[in-house]
Curated annotation (Swiss-Prot):
Annotated family: Belongs to the UPF0306 family.
SUPFAM superfamilies found in the cross-reference section: FMN-binding split barrel
Protein name, UniProt field: UPF0306 protein YhbP
HAMAP family for this protein: UPF0306
Gene (UniProt): yhbP
The species this protein was found in: Escherichia coli O8 (strain IAI1)
Amino acid sequence: METLTAISRWLAKQHVVTWCVQQEGELWCANAFYLFDAQKVAFYILTEEKTRHAQMSGPQAAVAGTVNGQPKTVALIRGVQFKGEIRRLEGEESDLARKAYNRRFPVARMLSAPVWEIRLDEIKFTDNTLGFGKKMIWLRDSGTEQA
């Protein structure tokens, strides 16, 4: 199975992302429900501009983060580590992403928080269900996939 396809299928079944930003040597992490766009290889999240992580992100910033399940045994561990860039969406781009996000999370219709995109540039997917320590790596710029 193609690496990005396997990663995308797993991410579509999850819903919480943790991402971290840094500014002037200070680190901060946050969690949010996400919508994953497999075509753009990006997460869409809602978060208020007044939050510490949004303030540190500014209009765009480098990010790293994870998505993981909560298995009860090591043999079932699956999770993603990633790096990329976060940016606040504006205008039509924001409107389209919000509509898709609201379809996945209808309760979000009540929120006015801005929409942000986390564009993934590198993904490492650990899937112990395929064998202990099995890792798949995807890199945006090189088109590289490693199993």
